[in-house]
């Protein structure tokens, strides 16, 4: 049943039909051709499984330019895709309504914010029956190769599902500033470098000493003054060395603490991933427990907050004493 507008895929088949229901709402159908027959599936995405490098594979610079052009971002490196925000907007572009851009953190700077965005992306993949497994644990690290592999796959997924409709990414974000995440390669613990001459104890004395008058012979400093100045310089050098040692120890302890937290996070993330795989294996059995587990895994922070509010209101309502009637 063809609709008023159609889009042709590269093989000549119609990729989308647009029809209207009884209420006049525009509903997209996506269809596939199997053995010469046309079959319709409601809201299904076209899955892409090929990840081999071909002539159509874009370079790192071309892929970033493509991302910035399509969704109006200002990314400069592939590693900045680790925030997941760009993928969320791509899904909203390909399948309007499958994800809420209000929940996407376009200004994400921390790893837990990246994970939040990828949880939203996972939920949209599940909603559209996308079979691709998102390697969240690798992507949020901001490593180049992991993020390049995923965006290369997503480019092919985009080409297979985009129907050519117009899309305004800035308007879709509703005014949210899409600030690129910081470069993951930057060192957090780098100390600012200062000029050795500026820190020299004799630099201030050289600037403050008045210019010698012409014709006058400058007096030589006594041995006592030279000894005192050299002693103060050695003491200041020792103080600076002690301060550097203390700062290095603090940096080392912070790095150890960070490694411990990351190991603990990876451990629990692996457990959740195993639970997710088990739920996906038994998802076709229509088990209520499996469905409830999937809802918990893919629930966003805002959704969890809303589910707790009604319970709190009910408890508050039960604790209120009954009002007395006025006579």
From Swiss-Prot:
**APC-binding: annotated segments:** 259-302
Q: Which UniProt keywords apply?
A: Cell cycle, Cell division, Cytoplasm, Cytoskeleton, Microtubule, Mitosis, Phosphoprotein
Write down which residues bear the modification named Phosphotyrosine.
167
- Enumerate the spans annotated as EB1 C-terminal domain: 236-306
Calponin-homology (CH) domain segment(s): 57-159
Q: What's any one GO cellular component for it?
A: microtubule
Show the GO MF annotations.
Answer: identical protein binding; microtubule plus-end binding; protein kinase binding
Identify the stretch(es) annotated as DCTN1-binding: 187-327
Q: Which GO terms describe its biological process?
A: cell division; positive regulation of ARF protein signal transduction; positive regulation of focal adhesion disassembly; positive regulation of keratinocyte migration
What are the Low complexity biased-composition ranges?
Answer: 200-234, 318-327
The record's annotation in Pfam families points to:
CH, EB1
Primary place of residence? cytoplasm
What residues bear Phosphoserine in this entry? 9, 219
| Stretches for region Disordered | 1-21, 171-240, 299-327
Q: What is known of its domains?
A: Composed of two functionally independent domains. The N-terminal domain forms a hydrophobic cleft involved in microtubule binding and the C-terminal is involved in the formation of mutually exclusive complexes with APC and DCTN1.
What family is reported?
A: Belongs to the MAPRE family.
**Assembly, per entry:** Interacts with DCTN1. Interacts with APC (via C-terminal). Interacts with monomeric and polymerized tubulin. Interacts with SLAIN1. Interacts (via the N-terminal region) with BAG1.
- Function recorded in the entry: May be involved in microtubule polymerization, and spindle function by stabilizing microtubules and anchoring them at centrosomes. May play a role in cell migration.
**Name of the protein described by the UniProt record:** Microtubule-associated protein RP/EB family member 2
Native species: Pongo abelii (Sumatran orangutan)
Q: What is the lineage of its organism?
A: Eukaryota, Metazoa, Chordata, Craniata, Vertebrata
Query: Gene for this protein?
Result: MAPRE2
């Amino acid at each position: 049943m063809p609709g008023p507008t159609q889009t042709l895929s590269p093989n000549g088949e119609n990729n989308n039909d647009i029809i209207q229901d009884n209420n006049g709402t525009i509903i997209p159908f996506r269809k596939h051709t199997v053995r010469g027959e046309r079959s319709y599936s409601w809201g299904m995405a076209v899955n892409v499984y090929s990840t081999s490098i071909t002539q159509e594979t874009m370079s790192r610079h071309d892929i970033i330019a493509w991302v910035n052009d399509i969704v109006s971002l200002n990314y400069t490196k592939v590693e900045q895709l680790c925030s997941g925000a760009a993928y969320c907007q791509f899904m909203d572009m390909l399948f309007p309504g499958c994800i809420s851009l209000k929940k996407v953190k376009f200004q994400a700077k921390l790893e837990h914010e990246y994970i939040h965005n990828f949880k939203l992306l996972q939920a949209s993949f599940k909603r559209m029956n996308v079979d691709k497994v998102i390697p969240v644990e690798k992507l949020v690290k901001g490593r180049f190769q992991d993020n390049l592999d995923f965006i290369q796959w997503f480019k092919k997924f985009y080409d297979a599902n985009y129907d050519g409709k117009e899309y305004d990414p800035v308007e879709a974000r509703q005014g949210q500033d899409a600030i690129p995440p910081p470069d993951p390669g930057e060192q957090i613990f780098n100390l600012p470098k200062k000029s050795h001459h500026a820190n020299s104890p004799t630099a201030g004395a050289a600037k403050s000493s008045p210019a010698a008058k012409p014709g006058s012979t400058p007096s030589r400093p006594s041995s006592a003054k030279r000894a005192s100045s050299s002693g103060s310089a050695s003491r200041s050098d020792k103080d600076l060395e002690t301060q550097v040692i203390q700062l290095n120890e603090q940096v080392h302890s912070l790095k150890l603490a960070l490694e411990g937290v990351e190991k603990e996070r990876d451990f629990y993330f692996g457990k959740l991933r195993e639970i997710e795989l088990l739920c996906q294996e038994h998802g076709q059995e229509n088990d209520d427990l499996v469905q409830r587990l999937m809802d918990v895994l893919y629930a966003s922070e805002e959704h969890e907050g809303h589910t707790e509010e009604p319970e709190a209101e009910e408890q508050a309502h039960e604790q209120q004493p009954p009002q007395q009637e006025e006579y």
